[in-house]
């Protein structure tokens, strides 16, 4: 299993431990609108860059995690952001063939989406090394 799949699986497994619906791709209708039942968390893009040198074979990555709420206030989305933080920030996630060196939240924002729902985004930065 490649590093990209390993990281995706580890993040997904950590997030499903919290009592929320978690998707790696939320279901959509033909027009691209979400058909997922709110509230939910969605794993967005995970961008990788090599971090190799003579001593270390690894990757750095940035993972974007989305929270979606239709509760009528930002509070639910912010609470979801807190649950995501608790599940991932400085977590020791098991990864087959990799060692997680670092995982930390860098940014978190909640804003109103065009459909009047609330959309939160957390960005996490991590580093992994091959074992």
Task: Enumerate the predicted regions with their spans.
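Histidine (H) residue identity feature
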Residues: 66, 89-90, 119
